[in-house]
């Protein structure tokens, strides 16, 4: 039912560093439209700092392959995944709000990936699904729910119906409009709080990066 998108984290060689090669960051789209994101470990750890859901999720998956050379360091990240996912809560909410706005703008936008849905429903059911799912995630995250729990929807049947395009265009427009309004209010209210990034997480990310890079070139 869902695409299987993959993240592939790469470690630069000594030659890459010595020759000042840019860190790898690219996406490969497979024939079945599934995506593989290739990203240098240095850049990937930066995505943790930016609190992007799409990149934080790998800390919570049960399906991964790890080079044994780096497993000890990776397991440190897994052990601290909740702390990492709450490293900078304001930025996390701002990032989720930004993603929500993008989904809202994409609802009726004519793009190659939307053509089939627009012809069928007049809107992208997939984008509406993402928007409503983000609203639920933000609601629970801003109320102190663990990241692991936030990832598990409490409205599976409804969201499945949305994703399958069971609702007409007028419903979709109203659902999207009211959702983005609620998200904006939640984000604004939360970001007024006095919350600082967690220094211990910053120290952990720096230490893991240092150790991985050291192992890679020695």
Give the role of each language-model region.
Residues 2, 9-11, 35-72, 79-92:
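Internal, well-ordered alpha/beta segment that forms a basic, Gly-enriched binding/recognition surface
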Residues 203-218:
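A cross-kingdom marker for long, charged
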Residues 68-207:
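Conserved nucleotidyltransferase catalytic core and NTase-mimicking acidic/glycine-rich helix/loop elements
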Residues 10, 48, 135-142, 216:
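Generic structural signal for hydrophobic core residues of well-folded globular domains
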Residues 29-30, 41, 60-62, 111-114:
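Short acidic (Asp/Glu) patches
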Residues 20-32, 48, 53:
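Conserved His + Asp/Glu catalytic blocks
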Residues 1-28:
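Catalytic metal-binding acidic patch
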């Amino acid at each position: 039912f869902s695409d299987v998108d993959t993240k592939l984290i790469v470690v630069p060689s000594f030659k890459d560093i010595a020759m000042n090669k840019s860190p790898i960051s690219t996406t490969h789209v497979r024939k079945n439209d599934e995506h593989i994101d290739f990203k240098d470990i240095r850049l990937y750890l930066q995505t943790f700092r930016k609190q992007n859901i799409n990149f934080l999720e790998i800390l919570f998956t049960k399906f991964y392959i790890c080079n044994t050379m780096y497993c000890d360091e990776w397991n440190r990240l897994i052990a601290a995944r909740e702390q990492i996912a709450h490293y900078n809560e304001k930025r996390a909410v701002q990032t989720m709000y930004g993603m929500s706005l993008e989904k809202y703008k994409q609802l009726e936008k004519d793009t190659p990936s939307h053509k089939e849905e627009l012809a069928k429903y007049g809107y992208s059911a997939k984008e509406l699904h993402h928007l409503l799912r983000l609203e639920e995630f933000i609601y629970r995250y801003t109320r102190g729910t663990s990241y692991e729990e936030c990832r598990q929807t409490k409205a599976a049947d409804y969201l499945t119906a949305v994703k399958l395009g069971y609702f007409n265009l007028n419903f979709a427009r109203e659902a999207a409009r009211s959702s983005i309004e609620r998200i904006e209010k939640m984000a604004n209210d939360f970001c007024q709080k006095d919350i600082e990034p967690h220094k211990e997480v910053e120290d952990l990310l720096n230490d893991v990066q240092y150790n991985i890079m050291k192992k890679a070139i020695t």
